[in-house]
Amino acid sequence: MLDSAKSSFPHISPLLTPLMYRLVGDIVLRRYFRTLEVQGQEQIPKRGPVILAPTHRSRWDALIIPYVTGRRVSGRDLYYMVSHDEMLGLQGWVIGQCGGFPVNTQAPSVSALRTGVDLLRQGQALVVFPEGNIFRDRQIHPLKPGLARLALQAAQRCQEAIQILPILLDYAQPYPQWGSEVKVIIGAPLSTGNYDVTHPKSAAQELTSDLLRALQQLQEGRSLLCLA
């Protein structure tokens, strides 16, 4: 079904993207947040197809993720699968110029999935928020099955396994205010090579469960650090 669907490649502006890295990273984030702590950047794959799977806590997420994992850290530009709401307004325009494309989080279209598969087939780094929507209660919510299905479908068409990178975004406030704190914890990647892609339904369920467990472990580790 995906093979017959058309996809339009997301756009990464050669002029705007490096400018936004400097503007967002060096000015906006550093001035807005009192501290932005990052752990686990050594886990980021420097090559090959990878899905970055962050928790979703704020509209700041789409700005923080490239700053802590993108071209300045890994040498890679990131593509984004984001909700239609996040493609609205000035932020949406910027995201659209920097690799973002919309997806219906309740019922992803075939064309959106096709775009994701094509990006991974080309060895790109794709950001997918597995919870689907923004949740501000600092709890890990049930994951949508789309990420696992996308990864496994891409794995069937690639010459190498797809890596899935769990990322925890933890804000000190539900609605981050000026001078607040944020912590980003990056876990060890999962690999589609550990799942039987010839049984896609059970493999997707297993991968989704493993990703949920990985995010929960990052959350538990963050809680233990706070108690220490």
Whereabouts are the PLM-identified features?
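Catalytic core of membrane glycerolipid acyltransferases/transacylases, capturing the structured
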Residues: 3, 46-107
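Helix-to-loop junction immediately C-terminal to a conserved catalytic motif
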Residues: 18-19, 25-56
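Short, well-ordered coil/turn elements that cap or connect secondary structure elements
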Residues: 30-33, 75, 95-97, 159
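A conditional alpha-helix N-cap/helix-loop micro-motif detector
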Residues: 34, 106-110
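Generic preference for hydrophobic
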Residues: 38, 52, 80-81, 164, ...
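Structural motif corresponding to alpha-helix initiation and N-cap regions
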Residues: 38, 88, 110-113
